Amino acid sequence: MHSPGFQYRLYYPRYISGYEKVKMYTTNQTNTMETGPHTKGIVIFGATGDLCKKKLIPALHKLWEKDLLPENFVITGSARRDPGVTVWKESLGEYPDEFMNHLDYISTDLDSVESLRHLPDYLEDNTYFLSVPPERYENAIVNLKEAGKLEDPERSRVVIEKPFGYDYKSAHHLQSVVERYLREKQVYRIDHYLGKDTVNNILATRFSNILLEPLWNRTYIEEVQIFATETIGCDGRAQYYETAGAVRDMLQNHILQVLALVAMEAPCKMSAREIRREKTKVLAATRLGEDMIFGQYQGYRDEEGVDPNSRTPTSVAGTLFVDNWRWEGVPFRVLTGKKMPYGCVEVVIKLKAPPLKLYDGEINDRIVIRLQPNPHLDIRMDIKSPGLDDNLELATLTHDYPQDRAVDGYEKLLYDAINCDQSHFVHADEVMESWRIVDDLLCTGEKCKIRTVPYIYIGGGWGPQHKVDRITDWDYPA
């Protein structure tokens, strides 16, 4: 035991500030007083992979440029392979030396408790980012806990990439592991759509404007259409896509999260707890319709890593219903897929026609929220054309969302995780309700409740269009 007033040195590695830094601690009879600031850090597992190089490090660099990272913030890359810190840094690309001085690398194995004990212990607040295959999540959480890295729920957290589970059963199992070793406040489940400014703007548009809220219900809305389409195919990801398909890749997460934001009730305050509670309530009231259509683009089965007899859907179209007071009877149409004519994420709110038709050529009013690309908000309505007759023409009020101030999804999500804000992360209950909704679509046997055998479609169309067009009169994006 040191005597009162004894001073000892704690060495910080040079990459915190570019040189070896010493912090002095002074003891007294009752406590240990630290004279320097707390140090935060993020440990990225899977740091030799593409996600780290292409998304995470660029996002952290942008936060650093904006002076939004703590002064002594440390970014530690980690993976089983050990290229060495110099080679790893060089593999990331060109960044200023001042930023690179915050980076370090240590080789660890998520399957080994002893290996994880070698992670830095000089950091007092840690965010652990699991940029690893989903099948490694369970061992990672268990072993990080056993290694003593997650003991303080106020100063340690785990960021988990999608997918959280493969179906309802596997998600339930993974959640049981999470509950056993972590508190929910320590778990940050990423859906990168929730980091997009334009997606977050859905709530701002709805709840900060009295103009729209009185119309936002079954009395005035005929249907809602949600598009998440791509012009590309699997683009080298066929092996992954073969195990995921359009349901797991898009519908279970991104599309249902957008639906929840469009359909949820106003939270009593803009906190993580209240926002996620309202989203969960909407998802709990959501069910599939009976007109779900699967498609698979022609040539998919010829791609490397794909079963020649694959039934994996590359497109899904159909209807969901939200069985609550606000939305009873209003169909939510969804369309997602690859190799389609136009790539975008868009929400179309189609309003009902007036009770009495006084003019010829009336078109239902629409509110269109384009999330990407070229994000904007449109309000489309009929007005009288200039002239002597009573012809109508479409008028569009458009607000283009300014992109010069927009932030990348991972930039927003990393900033929130580091600062312990779960507002834009997915709660366990949301995950389980989402899997419940789509679970019937994952059936591959002969006794499936819904036909899950995909119709083959030629790239450049809206999936198997002869089937898709029977669902509704789509407002296809352009």
Predicted features and spans:
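Secretory/organelle targeting and membrane-embedding segments
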Residues: 25-159, 164-478
